[in-house]
Amino acid sequence: MTPLLLSVLALLALALYIFWVEPLGVLPVLERLTPNLTYRIRTRHPLVALSFDDGPHPIFTPKVLDILQQHNAHATFFLIGERALRHPELVARIKAAGHEVANHYFTNGSLLFHSDADFARHLEQTEQALGIAAGPKFFRPPGGVARSRQLRLAQAHGYECILGSAYPHDPLHPPVGYIRWLVTKNLNPGTIVILHDGISNPTRTIQALPQILAAARRKGLRIVSIGALGNAGCSGVRSAASSSGC
């Protein structure tokens, strides 16, 4: 085996390790490389933010809401605008249950080839579909990928651009045990968890959710929305800037 091939295999192994294990040591690097994105919110309070992407879904979103209610937990739902227009009753139910709605763009697809005008228009269409009122506004790009200029445009529209620090890649349908393990090992004050309720079949995510919530409780952590975590934070989102938590 040549040194070049060994180097390629080593890099591939490292990439797979980072992708599937998500060591916390990678976070500071990501934060320095992408300062327009928030991955976690520093806080001394025992709080973790839970978020769900790609809804609302007429079958799976209600199941997630029922589990959250049973565990007295709250979350931020990053909703796709065109799906919100198809299911306004679910948007209303999410809000009525005390959860937070946030902008996940109008369609579910890559943003990389969208013009600035199209990006701004779809961002505003989704905001109108969700009825986002005054207060902190959060945007998560589809697939977690956007050009720097698009992130700056979102910020110019008053949005904080949010990713996360515990993501089990549930759209790839990994085992329930992996979803539970990956999220649970990364549950620390200030963690932002990314899960999906709007993918084709999030059954494993829904099965893992009660276990994740129970693990957080055993760690003495309370599950809240991103806005609530920001209000208790030291830094990260603008709403945390005046916090006395640190």
PLM regions with names:
Residues V145-R147, L151-N186, G220-A232:
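His/Asp/Glu-enriched short active-site or ligand-binding loop at hydrolase and phosphoryl-transfer sites
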